[in-house]
Structures are given as structure tokens and as C-alpha cells.
């Protein structure tokens, strides 16, 4: 749930000649994001985390960089000229969209984007911050619970990862906690959350993550 300093990370990447790729799947649904101003060379996010359908996402990239990338799938619409001896590829983005597109998912993603725009991303972000602040204060009161990352809402999105120890100092495995909470009708996730190296950085095997969104109420927290 940490809000990362993208401009500083972009500067460091450029200083060593590296490409800067941003996974914004958690940020785009929750915060106003001006993609072009992030300093990213490539930025991606998914539909299902922003009240959209599964099976679709967005990749934004600098056009000059996209032109250098070869296609990763073959099929209709991604070629420019084909003969028996050679072929050339269509310019971006067509070269990356081979075959029949996910039409229903694209319509659903567009509807989700329109819905969030109508709500106002500033309003979504304000709600997220209020819910996250309430959750942080509630979690801090639990003995043996350790919050991973910043403990103030201004530096976080609507996700909080934590570990839990018993009063005897024994670690409660996130999968056990997840199953226990599930039996009480509470949905959390246990594991690495696609970030195993980060867990090693924090010195923990795995964690439990509670995620909040625009429909979450204080009573549910």
C-alpha cells in the first residue's frame, strides 16, 4: 500500500541508463494519476482492481520505446506486410494486439473508467485516505500486530499488509489467519502479494493484507 516516490525512482533509473517500468495496478484505481508526468517509460494497470472486468489491462508506454519492442504474439492485425520471404509488423499499438480483441472486457473497462471519472478520483482518494487512517489506528491497537510500510495514511493507498504474533511471541501464519477471518465473513489475503523480495527486505516470510476501496465503510473495517 505504500505510495512510492516515482519521480525520484525515475531519476535514479535514468542516471544508470535503465528503463523505468511502473506497475500502477494499485494506484490507478485509488489516486489521481497523470501518467505522462510520472517519469515512467512504461506503465501498466489492470481492470479488475478498478471495478472493471478481469482479463484486461492497460499498457502505456513512450512511443519511441514501443516502436523498438517486437511483438510477443502472432495473429491478425499485428502485421503490416507479409510475403514468402519476409514480413513487417504494424506500428504500435496494433503490433501488440494480435487476433480477436477482448471486446466485452474493453467495453467493461471503459465503463469502469467513466464511472470512476464521474465519481471524481479526488473523492475516491479522500475516501481511501479516511478509511485507511481508521484502519491503521484500529490495527495499531492490536497487541502483536506489526504494520508493514508507513503507518500514516498520507503515504499509503488503500491496502495494509501486516504480520501477527500471539501473546507468547509465536508467529500466526497469514494463511491460518486468512482462513479464520474467512470463516467469520472477513476477506483478506495471505501470502507474498506478488512481492516476495519485499518480504525478504522486511525480514518476514509472508503477510496478511487487508484492502479497502470506495465501497468500504468504517463498520466493515
Question: What residue spans do the PLM features occupy?
Answer:
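Pyridoxal 5′-phosphate
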Residues: 1-221
Amino acid at each position: 500500500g505504500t505510495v512510492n516516490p516515482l519521480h525520484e525512482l525515475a531519476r535514479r533509473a535514468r542516471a544508470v541508463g535503465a528503463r523505468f517500468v511502473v506497475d500502477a495496478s494499485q494506484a490507478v484505481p485509488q489516486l489521481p494519476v497523470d501518467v505522462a508526468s510520472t517519469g515512467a517509460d512504461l506503465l501498466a494497470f489492470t481492470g479488475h482492481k478498478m471495478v472493471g472486468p478481469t482479463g484486461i489491462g492497460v499498457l502505456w508506454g513512450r512511443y519511441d520505446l514501443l516502436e523498438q519492442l517486437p511483438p510477443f504474439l502472432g495473429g491478425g492485425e499485428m502485421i503490416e506486410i507479409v510475403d514468402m520471404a519476409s514480413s513487417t509488423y504494424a506500428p504500435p499499438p496494433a503490433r501488440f494486439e494480435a487476433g480477436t480483441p477482448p471486446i466485452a472486457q474493453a467495453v467493461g473497462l471503459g465503463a469502469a473508467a467513466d464511472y470512476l471519472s464521474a465519481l471524481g478520483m479526488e473523492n475516491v482518494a479522500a475516501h481511501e485516505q479516511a478509511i485507511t487512517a481508521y484502519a491503521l489506528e484500529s490495527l495499531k491497537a492490536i497487541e502483536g500486530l506489526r504494520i508493514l510500510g508507513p503507518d500514516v495514511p498520507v503515504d499509503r493507498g488503500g491496502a495494509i499488509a501486516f504480520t501477527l504474533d500471539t501473546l507468547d511471541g509465536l508467529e500466526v501464519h497469514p494463511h491460518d489467519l486468512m482462513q479464520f477471518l474467512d470463516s467469520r465473513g472477513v476477506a483478506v489475503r495471505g501470502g507474498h502479494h506478488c512481492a516476495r523480495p519485499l518480504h525478504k527486505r522486511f525480514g518476514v516470510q509472508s503477510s496478511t493484507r487487508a484492502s479497502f476501496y470506495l465501497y468500504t465503510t468504517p463498520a466493515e473495517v
